A protein has these predicted regions:
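Short extracytoplasmic
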Residues: 35-67
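Hydrophobic membrane-insertion alpha-helices, especially the h-region
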Residues: 2-18
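Active-site-proximal structural scaffolding
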Residues: 6-10, 36, 178, 203
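A cross-kingdom signal targeting lumenal/periplasmic-facing segments of multi-pass membrane
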Residues: 65-206, 213, 217-218
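Residues embedded in well-ordered secondary-structure elements
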Residues: 32, 56-58, 127, 174
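ATP/Mg2+-dependent ligation/transfer catalytic cores
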Residues: 3, 14, 36-37, 185
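Alpha-helical transmembrane signal-anchor/signal-peptide segments
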Residues: 22-40
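A short linear-motif detector with a strong N-terminal bias
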Residues: 21-25, 44-49, 57-60, 116-117, ...
Length: 220
């Protein structure tokens, strides 16, 4: 019973704050991913990918970057997806458009990938808000193929991974800062011949060179 009461109080407080304390949402200025560099050190994106209008509408992203960055070795490839959402509030007046960020763990099974390892790990790549954060680390499988995935939510000066933190900070920032903008950053590398350590080293090397470039594209 106490959990039900707490849940009802949370819903009531949520409604009050959203309705009366945060009516005019702040949309921060940022640089479009159209100008994002396609060469970072020895990594090159030669095949930027485009979403169909239907997929983009379903994701609710305002802007995105999706590309395979390749190194000098043909086996060196990092798939990058960043979806930026300038707001995660459904517009008043209805409509079916969903603006909130979709957690990757909800989408992977639908694309045929099974999550066989899942952890939350600390990250300290240069360029992260505050210099540190957390990421979810997945190993995913489809048949004999294996991939290593890092993803985190880089939003309003934080890099966080846990879904309950995402919900909590979105609620607080909407109330206190009138902002709900945020981004999902996802990096994926193939695991060749079960060499998980090699995939990890490749992803870390890429991220250390890639993450500092996000300044200006993801508002803090």
């Amino acid at each position: 019973v106490s959990r039900i009461v707490v849940a009802l109080l949370f819903v009531a407080l949520n409604f009050y704050i959203y309705r009366y304390l945060a009516t005019d949402e702040v949309i921060p200025e940022r640089t479009s991913f159209e100008s994002f560099p396609m060469e970072i050190e020895d990594w090159k994106c030669r095949d930027p990918q485009q979403m169909t209008p239907e997929i983009l509408e379903n994701l609710g992203a305002t802007d995105y970057l999706m590309c395979n960055f390749r190194g000098d070795d043909p086996k060196e490839v990092v798939n990058v997806y960043i979806g930026y959402h300038e707001t995660q509030v459904r517009k008043e007046g209805g409509g079916s458009k969903e603006n909130s960020i979709h957690p990757p763990e909800h989408c992977l099974p639908g694309s045929g990938w099974d999550v066989i390892e899942a952890d939350v790990i600390p990250i300290d790549f240069e360029g992260l808000p505050g210099g540190t954060g957390e990421a979810k680390r997945f190993v995913i499988a489809k048949g004999n193929a294996r991939q290593l995935v890092y993803f985190w939510y880089q939003s309003r000066g934080r890099a966080i991974a846990r879904n309950h933190d995402v919900i909590l900070y979105r609620f607080l920032d909407r109330a206190m800062r009138r902002r709900t903008d945020g981004s999902l950053v996802r990096l994926t590398v193939p695991i060749w011949q079960e060499d998980e350590a090699g995939a990890e080293a490749e992803l870390d090397r890429f991220a250390s060179e890639f993450v500092p470039k996000l300044d200006g594209y993801i508002p803090n």
